Structures are given as C-alpha cells and as structure tokens.
Amino acid sequence: MVRKSPGSGKEEDFTFISPVVKYLLIFFNMLFWVISMVMVGIGVYARLLKHAEAAMACLAVDPALLLIGVGILMFLITFCGCIGSLRENICLLQTFSICLTLVFLLQLAVGIVGFIFSDKARGKVSEIISNAIEHYRDDLDLQNLIDFGQKEFSCCGGISYKDWSQNMYFNCSSENRSQERCSVPYSCCLHDEGEAVINTLCGQGMQELDYLEAGEFIHTNGCIDRLVNWIHSNLFLLGGVALGLAIPQVTKHLRAKLIYTWRIGIQV
C-alpha cells in the first residue's frame, strides 16, 4: 500500500496489516500466557507439598521443576508477544520474534542430534531412568510418573526388572531390612483386565526369580527398549505432532514480523 507523507513529495511504502492479524497474535499469546501461569502454579504447588529433604534429593528428575521451568519460559516469551503486539512495541516484538526462532531451532536441533547420536541419546535416557528408579520412593510425582510409564508400556525397570535393585528399598542386599527387599513396584505386575482390586504387593520377591519364572507374574522387559520400539512405530505420528507444534510458532513469528515491519514503516 502506497502512502504519501504530508508536506513531502516522497512516496513511502507501507505494508497494510489487517487488525485480524494483530488481534489473533494477541489472542494466542494471551491463551499461552494463561497456560504458562497455570503450569507455574501447579509446579510451585507440587514443590511446596514435598518434604524439603526429599525435594532436594531428586531435583534432576522432578516433574514439578520441569513444569515450573517450561512455564516461566513460556510466560516470558508470550509476555513479549502479547504486550508487544498490543502496544505495537518494536523492541518487544523483535524480542518475541527472536525467542520463537530460537525455540524452533532448538527443537529442530534436539531432534537432529537425537537421531544422529541415537546411541548416546539412549545412554542419557538410561541414566535418567536409573536416577528416577533410585529416587522412586522420595517423590510422589516421580513415583506416579514411573508407575504410569511402566503400566502404559508394559515394562519394568530401565533395561530389565533387575534394575529395581538400584533402589534402596527394593535392593536385594542382605543389609536391606525393608519389606520391599528384592521386590518390584506393583506397576510391573501382569494384571487381569477384569481385576477390580489391584494387589500392590504382587511384585514381592520378584527379583529373586529368573526371567522365565518372573515372566509369569511381571513384565520383565525394560522400558528403554519398549520406548524405542514405540518411537519407531509412531514416527509419522510424532512427526505430525512436531509439525503441529511448529506451525503455531512459525505463524506467530510471521505475524510478529509483519507488525514489526509495519511499525518500522510508520516511523520512517
């Protein structure tokens, strides 16, 4: 769209930005802004409910910290986008655009690195799972997450059900006086579909059995192999989800760029 500045004979080129673009950007940023505050609130609430010693012992595998971290990052980015587009502030719009670009490139880089260095990625996943097993009883959120994963993937432990010996309560050593000695969590057990009441002691003493004997009562395969197989069989689905996450980022980036370019044009 061509406009003429009053009192000057020069023509200046401005790109017309529809109010729809502006208010769509504001709407989506406000939506994710609210979501980010909810995530931070849930994460902080979950952290406050935990005992101080237990909370400090398993910081690396605490789902609450992940919620808080992602929530704060999302809050800051959407704050720049929302206020920047509402006030048409060039600095905030540029910051928002750069942040979205960095997040998108980071997601892309993680996917590529994970694919190229799959062995190292597998080792890192194994390390995270081992750490989670070690702190299974220290954090209720982590415990629920592990139980959910083992039930969903029909697995037990990282590499095998024997990995549960890494936990001080399930350890098979003679020094361990726990009632759960040499056992596995109930989420490892084979359950009948029509079973009304779940026996939480079904994993008692399972680590003392060999694979064939234990296989009659619990899942003996590790969760790492199950997870890798699930990823391989759902590559197209995961690709679609990744694309679905990328499209809003790209469109918001483009809208921010349009408004930013428009504002620069007006100030020329």
UniProtKB/Swiss-Prot annotation:
It is a multi-pass membrane protein. It is found in: Cell membrane; Cell junction, Adherens junction; Cytoplasm. CDD domains: penumbra_like_LEL. The chain crosses the membrane at residues 24-44, 64-84, 96-116, 227-247. Keywords: Cell junction, Cell membrane, Cytoplasm, Disulfide bond, Glycoprotein, Membrane, Transmembrane, Transmembrane helix. Residues 45-63, 117-226 are extracellular. InterPro entries: Tetraspanin/Peripherin, Tetraspanin_animals, Tetraspanin_EC2_sf. Disulfide bonds join 155-223, 156-188, 172-182, 189-202. The keyword Membrane applies. Glycans are attached at residues 171, 176. Pfam families: Tetraspanin. Its main location: membrane. Homodimer; disulfide-linked. Part of TspanC8 subgroup, composed of 6 members that interact with the transmembrane metalloprotease ADAM10. This interaction is required for ADAM10 exit from the endoplasmic reticulum and for enzymatic maturation and trafficking to the cell surface as well as substrate specificity. Different TspanC8/ADAM10 complexes have distinct substrates. This is Tetraspanin-33. The gene is tspan33.
